[in-house]
Every structure is written in structure tokens, then in C-alpha cells.
């Protein structure tokens, strides 16, 4: 049986708060500050890296095989690439954004002055009564534009609002928590795992438990572009557990109600010894952990290894439906993931 009391209420509320805090790759300071405040409130000292990620070091009963856990707070997003002659905006994705999924979505343009200007993402010349190809036209960065909720019809008028090339664009997350326990939102990847990590650490602290090994927590902020997982982690790490969303789809075992362990992704297999240990730990604690292989996937663990990291690496996370779209998970998967993290922290 599990040894820790995981507060599902805290976990879900923390996730909701994170989801409502914009953090596209490259513009994550507010979300990092939120996580920093949560950890500091638990009595855990934190530091920022030069790149803006968050590090926390927790003393363990031993330091013979130091550990790290990492989850990323950066999400999909976009930046202003061009102010068009008609005053509307052409965007560029900062990572793996799928353009059809953000059509008609509300958004905010964050200006250098701190103002947030509302608008929406639409197909250029998208009126069905005018353009007979509106329903079949491709949706991509060249065919879609931001329609600002301001009176502007020229590029000069848009610039007078304070908007300029390079401004970040925050798509509305549209967070909903259902009575049946589902959480539906954009950007559950990977804020769900950040919330799970916080809930696990909270459960461990409240139980007055100590990690089995000296442990580093890394909240990375450049995972979605491939260089988050190597940021300032100790050189003497023996193992790293990456916390990232589990895939759901045809041919996979994962679902929205369970935690999964990825044994191989696009970068190759993860460490068998560490993965086997985590699977055994889940079995002993009654956690139904689903093994899986992800066909189109990479993680901060892959980035850590590519940068020369020597530690063993494993990857776990809650099942998330429709990744990089309007995502959904369930509190059962979140609770199981947090429980497994807490168990791993203290496991001998």
C-alpha cells in the first residue's frame, strides 16, 4: 500500500493555477515564480539557473547515488512574426504548435510595456460567405492571422498599440474541471507533471519523511525546443526520473486514468535497470503503472543524455489525451503519478 497522503484537491488546484499562468517556451518567468513560491512555502530552498529554470536541492539520508526529478513548465506558444499591412498579425510557432488546433481560439498579445491586447486566431479571408475555399483551405502560419480586438486597419495603427515583432502570444487555455474528475485544457503537457511533483513533495514533507538519496528537482523551461533537461543538474547524478505526459492513441496502453512508464521513444530506449526498479516499486505499492513505447516523442531525459549526461534515466507521467491540442487527463492519473513520485523519493 502507498505510504503517503496525496491531496488531490491541492494537486488539481495547483494544476488549474499553473494552466491559467501563461508560459510559452522563452517566456516562463511567472510560472517559474509560482512553482518557486510553492516549494519555498514547503521549506525547500530554490535557485534560478542562468537560463531561468528552477532548481531545488533536498538533502537525503545518503548521497551515494544522487537523484534528480525533472518536469517542464514551458508550453506551446507563438510570437508575432509580422505586422501585416491590414493591421493583423502573422505568427511564428516557438515549438510544436499545431495550427489547426488554435483556429478561432482567443488569445492575448503581450507587449513590451506589459499590456495584454486581446484577439483571436482566424483564417485569413475566412468568411464562408466570401471565400468558397474557407472550409478546405490549409491551416498554417501563412494562412492564419491574429484578428485584434482593437480598431486597427493598418500596420502603423497596430504599432501604436504597442505591438511589435517578437511579442509573445498567449492562447487561452480554457481550463475546465468536471464533476467526474476530468481536467480539460490546453497545456496540460507538462504542467500536469509539475503539479504532480509539487503534490508529491508536499505529501513527503507533511509525513516528515526524508528522501533516500540527495535529490535535485529541476523545473525546466526549454523542454519543448529540446534543451531543458541539462540545465545545471549536478554532475554526479546516478539517476534521473523525467516527469512528462504519457501518450494516448492507437497501439498504446496508456489512458487518462493511469500513470505510464515510457520504455522507449524516438530517441531510443530509457534505462532498463531504473525503469525495472520503478515498475517493481509501483507493484509493491499497488499503483497500476502502464508500460508503453511512444513513436514520436522526446523528453528532457533525451536532452540530458545528448548533452553528455551519465546518469540512468526513466520517464513516467499521467495519460494525456490529444497531446498538443485541447488536452484532457483525469485526477486518478494525476494522483497515481504523484503517489509514485513520493514513493520513489523515499525508496531505498
Regions found by a protein language model. Give the residues of each.
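N-terminal hydrophobic/helix-forming segments and targeting peptides
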Residues: 1-348
